[in-house]
Amino acid sequence: RGIDLPEHGDRTGETDFTPWQVVPELQTVLAYLQQHWQGIRLRANSIGAYFSMLAFAGTTIEKALFVSPIVDMERLICDMMQWAKVTPEQLCEKGEITTELGQTLSWRYLCWVRQHPLDGWQIPTAILYAGQDTMTSRDTVTAFAQKHHAELTVYEPGEHWFHTPAQLDAMQTWEQAHR
């Protein structure tokens, strides 16, 4: 079974896509799953992996499969600030700044991320990383995998969003190998 996060899939009309809203929702979903099923595994992409790690650290999930996970949100936000030529002082002063690419940078979000690091993740994890990922650097995902003893697979021609037939085939093969 799967769920859509706000702004995704069947929930595109919902707009509150912040960790302080999504993490409690995911914890509620996990509580429901634990009442109805014994073995629970997690499959998440991108920011869904980040939110899941915040929500499920310290739980009894058997295994996690992450595709193109955001494993260092602070680094990503700081990179986005650099790309948009926004200083921390500017973001602090304005609170929110919308970039030319349509992304909204938020001082509150950055502060929240800094106050809630991904420290407690100990669930056995396999990661499929795209060699052409522009959201998370290879060094960042490699360091995360080493720190958290995660199995890391790199699909060199992949992009952050696996979407071409070849990328989807590679992802499916990886998923089957990690069931």
Language-model-derived ranges and their functions:
Residues D16-Q35:
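Alpha/beta-hydrolase active-site loop
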Residues G39, T59-A143, K147-V154, G158-H178:
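The alpha/beta-hydrolase serine catalytic core
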Residues G2-I3, A44, F66:
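Conserved SAM-binding loop
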Residues G9-D10, A49-Y50, D72, W161:
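Short secondary-structure capping/turn micro-motifs that flank functional sites
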Residues R1-T12:
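Conserved alpha/beta-hydrolase
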Residues D4, S46, G131:
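Nucleotide-sugar donor-binding loop of glycosyltransferases
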